[in-house]
Amino acid sequence: MRYWNRWCSAVTLLGFAAPLAAQGSGGAAMPATPVTSDMLLNAQQSGDWLMYGGNYWNNRHSPLNTINTTNVKNLVPRWVFQTGSEQNASLETTPVVVNGIIYFTSAVAPNNLVFAYDLKTGKPVWQKELKVASNAFGVACCGRNNRGVAVANGMVYVATLDAHLVALDQATGDVKWDVVVGDPAQGYTETMAPLALDGNVIIGTSGAE
């Protein structure tokens, strides 16, 4: 997917409607629901998608069964959102879903973008643009990309290409804190999705990635 998207002028995030689900217009998403440590520990039992790998085992399995091998062929788009992309960038984000709100990222130059959208309607709850230092572009090993966020304790955590770890308010997208975890001048960048665990945020960094 990474290489294919380098040739695309735009990438899209699709919301699909299952034919067996209610087809009404649907109400707006509930107010931002803080994700607790207990919710994350039991994520494999949730109908939401609370973290990058689905749960701490990273098995990317959902217990939901409304969409199955019988009716998947009948899915139709409910809404489409263009995140924007370009040559030398790609869409590699894994969306996180919490109580009707979908959180995802994009790495369109020159900055990192974080989005919170109503899962049913495709309408924005908030969008945040995080400025990225230009010296990160030349050292990123595989083009500009971002793999997603961690949501926990009322915060949305995201890493930026220039090796910052940023905490955003889950309800508003406002920056709560911003820390440096690496230096692009020394070849360090960040593209990974952070991991929230027991009140902490875990992130790694390595040369040129």
Predicted regions and their residues:
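N-terminal export/assembly segments and adjacent metallocofactor-ligating motifs
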Residues: 75, 112-115, 121-122, 200
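Repeat-blade elements of multi-bladed beta-propeller folds
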Residues: 50-53, 88-113, 138-164, 189-209
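Mature extracytoplasmic enzyme cores
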Residues: 113, 164-176
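Aromatic (tryptophan-biased) beta-strands that constitute blades/sheets of beta-rich domains
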Residues: 24-85, 123-138, 174-183
